[in-house]
């Protein structure tokens, strides 16, 4: 399992959630990552699937309703290093799926990770 510090040392993030609504955390996380020089892909409102991303993904950030999140994760054919589950995006089904498939994850907030560990890449 990666620590938040290790996660923030990665380069490419996929944010799952409503990244077009300025009032939503997914939007704030996407903007924060971009401002710190990370490569960011937005899935949910901008892209429909993680599989649409041609580049390799380091981190997937779940900032989306758990029902939509589990669907996107199950459809994902891409390799990645870790998933960050934002508060409110977790469910027993997601945790069980990740554990059964040996997918590394942490529960946490990338906004806090940005504040504590991000350096301009």
Identify the meaning behind each predicted range:
Residues 45-46, 66, 86-91, 109-113:
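Short, acidic/turn-prone active-site loops that include or flank metal/cofactor-
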Residues 104-121:
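Active-site capping/gating segments
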Residues 42-73:
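Glycine-rich, highly charged phosphate/nucleotide-binding loops
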Residues 79-98:
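ADP-ribose/adenylate-binding Rossmann-like module
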Residues 15, 61-62, 85:
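Redox-cofactor binding/interface segments in oxidoreductases and associated redox assembly factors
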Residues 9-10, 55-59, 79:
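Alpha-helix C-terminal capping/helix-to-coil transition sites in glycosyltransferase folds
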Residues 38, 81, 103:
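Short phosphate-binding/catalytic loops that engage adenosine nucleotides
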Residues 1-44, 51:
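Hydrophobic, well-ordered beta-alpha structural blocks that scaffold small-molecule cofactor pockets
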């Amino acid at each position: 399992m990666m620590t938040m510090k290790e996660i923030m040392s990665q380069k490419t993030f996929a944010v799952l959630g409503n990244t077009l609504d300025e009032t939503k955390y997914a939007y704030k996380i996407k903007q924060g990552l971009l401002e710190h020089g990370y490569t960011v892909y937005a899935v949910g409102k901008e892209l429909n699937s993680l599989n649409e991303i041609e580049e390799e993904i380091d981190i997937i950030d779940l900032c989306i309703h758990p029902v939509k999140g589990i669907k996107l994760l199950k459809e994902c054919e891409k390799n990645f290093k870790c998933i960050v589950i934002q508060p409110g995006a977790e469910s027993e089904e997601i945790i069980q799926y990740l554990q059964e498939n040996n997918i590394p994850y942490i529960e946490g907030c990338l906004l806090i990770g940005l504040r504590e560990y991000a350096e301009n890449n």
